[in-house]
Each structure stands twice: as C-alpha cells, then as structure tokens.
Swiss-Prot record:
The lineage of its organism: Bacteria, Pseudomonadati, Pseudomonadota, Alphaproteobacteria, Rhodobacterales. NCBIfam families: pufA_517_ASD (NF040861). This is Light-harvesting protein B-875 alpha chain. Residues 1-15 are cytoplasmic. GO terms for molecular function: bacteriochlorophyll binding; electron transporter, transferring electrons within the cyclic electron transport pathway of photosynthesis activity; metal ion binding.
Length: 58
C-alpha cells in the first residue's frame, strides 16, 4: 500500500477524474430515469396527484 502513489505514473490523473465524472453523471441519469419509469417512485406524477393538477395516468 505504501507504493500505491505509483499508479499515477501509469494513469494520467486528469483523464481518470474526467472519466470518473462522466461515469458518475451517466450513472445518476440512469438511476433517475429508472425511478421515473416506476409508478411508486415517479415524483412527478405523485406531486401532480397530491396537488390535483393533472389526472394520473393508470
């Protein structure tokens, strides 16, 4: 573990952090789209039904 810093001699830190940021953003988008596609976790329809703005599609 004491020589773990040498990993940055193999990988460019800027590219690693950019790739990590892109991966985390795409993961967050995917999770949100999955949640919006389920009826029990779709906060848009739940909010609309709560305030009687739009009829919820069954």
């Amino acid at each position: 573990m004491s020589k773990f810093y040498k990993i940055w001699m193999i990988f460019d830190p800027r590219r690693v952090f950019v790739a990590q940021g892109v991966f985390l953003f795409l993961l967050a988008v995917m999770i949100h789209l999955i949640l919006l596609s389920t009826p029990s976790y779709n906060w848009l329809e739940i909010s609309a039904a709560k305030y009687n703005r739009v009829a919820v599609a069954e």
